């Protein structure tokens, strides 16, 4: 009770709070046009590995497994274009989980993004982060043509990688992905 009375007295004497030196800038800040230049699309809420350290917990992120629909991704790209102002270069990162588990939607969204470039005077830079398990010749050809960057996940030499990045059944993934990465 004594502490509450003391706090009330300090508040009444205007000595409890310091002056907000940033308050005068709030009006200008709120009036600024917000420009969005990049999006990270959580395209796959699922994964085909069971990495020991993964924050996503096999792609589940403490939730049920799911894949982003084309419609949701399309709305995201529309949002990016609508809120990019005069910025020409826009970035979209396909992330997960494992984005290649939703490959058709990735391809469709890249095609949709490309269709927006000329009419809106925009240029998309696409990036994809993958563990490499699902890579094949068709996917690699598309990635080489359409992606500005491809992030390949590997944890070091075979013993380390296989211990840290196993399949759900426990077997290592190194021997499957390294030849694909080398290709």
Regions found by a protein language model. Give the residues of each.
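N-terminal [4Fe-4S]-dependent radical SAM core
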Residues: 3-40, 85
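Short, well-ordered loop/turn elements at secondary-structure boundaries
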Residues: 36, 48, 145-148
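Long, contiguous hydrophobic alpha-helical segments, chiefly transmembrane helices and signal peptides
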Residues: 38-44, 55-56, 129, 154, ...
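Canonical Radical SAM [4Fe-4S] cluster-binding loop centered on the CxxxCxxC motif
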Residues: 40-71
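Short acidic donor-binding/metal-coordinating loop in glycosyltransferase active sites
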Residues: 43, 96-97
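Radical SAM/AdoMet-radical enzyme domain recognition
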Residues: 73, 77-93, 102-183
């Amino acid at each position: 009770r004594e502490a509450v009375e003391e706090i009330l007295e300090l508040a009444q004497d205007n000595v409890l709070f310091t002056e907000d030196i940033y308050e005068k800038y709030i009006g200008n800040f709120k009036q600024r046009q917000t420009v969005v230049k990049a999006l990270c699309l959580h395209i796959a809420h699922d994964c085909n590995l069971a990495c020991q350290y993964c924050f996503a917990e096999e792609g589940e992120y403490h939730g049920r497994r799911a894949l982003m629909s084309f419609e949701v991704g399309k709305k995201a790209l529309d949002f990016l274009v609508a809120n990019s102002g005069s910025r020409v270069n826009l970035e979209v990162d396909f992330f997960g989980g494992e984005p290649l588990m939703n490959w058709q939607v990735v391809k469709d969204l890249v095609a949709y993004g490309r269709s927006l470039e000329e009419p809106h005077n925009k240029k998309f830079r696409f990036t994809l982060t993958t563990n490499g398990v699902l890579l094949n010749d068709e996917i690699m050809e598309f990635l080489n043509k359409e992606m500005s960057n491809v992030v390949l996940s590997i944890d070091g030499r075979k013993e380390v990688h296989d211990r840290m990045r196993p399949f759900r059944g426990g077997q290592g993934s190194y021997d499957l992905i390294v030849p694909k990465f080398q290709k």
